[in-house]
Amino acid sequence: MGKRMTARHSVFALLSFLLALTSSPAEAEMYVAGQVGLNLPHSLSNVEDRRGGVTFDENDQSLKSSVMYGAKLGYYFESLKWLGVETEVFKTTPYLTQQHVTTLGGINFLNAPGAHLSVLTWAPANIVVRHQMGAFEPYAGIGLGFNSSRLSVGRGTSKGGGPGLNTQLGLRYRITTNLAVFGEWKFNHANLEYTDFIFKGRDLSVNYNAHNVVFGVGYHF
């Protein structure tokens, strides 16, 4: 049921964004951009391991940094040049290090093996604001995110995902009227749920929080 609702919200957000694009004035400033950078995740928090009707609250689990890459598409309104809307997608692949796992109840598990985590984030409609200062444009944005994730331990892979929050703060520099480069700090929060994690009947829930320092190139129409 939750996955169906998330899918419906995703489709609705995409349709709303496309409708806004098609109904905007022809003079509206549109842009596309590519971005790449460094993902700096916090430890996974609020870790809940559920099996056999019992929930184990586990300690936070460390993640290593990774490369982040993605793309943006958006536009600024002609009547409100400081206000715009943007959709973006980006992927990170932080590594879950091998570490000792305990529960808040004091139960000690063996060392958990390392795991490969990938998180694909789609922010369908970030609201963005900017301040035009000649060639320089500081900007900020915020929006909901939808996250699709894979967690691989040994030969087993579990798929999951969940909603989240996406924020950004950056500085754009116009090389020409159409070509721009930018640097950006981005924060991503997500609650990730994995069903039948490693084996059937075991579910895992975690909070994923990460800073991203990115650079990119954009083309403005």
Regions found by a protein language model. Give the residues of each.
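Short N-terminal segments immediately surrounding and downstream of signal-peptide cleavage
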Residues: 31-43
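Sec/Tat signal peptide C-region and signal peptidase I cleavage site
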Residues: 24-28
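Bacterial N-terminal signal peptides
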Residues: 12-22
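Bacterial N-terminal signal peptides that target proteins for export
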Residues: 2-13
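Outer-membrane beta-barrel translocator domains and adjoining extracellular loop/strand segments
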Residues: 44-53, 97-104, 149-158, 193-200
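N-terminal, post-signal-peptide region of Sec/Tat-exported proteins
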Residues: 51-85
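Gram-negative (and chloroplast) outer-membrane scaffold detector with strong preference
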Residues: 29, 40, 72-154, 173, ...
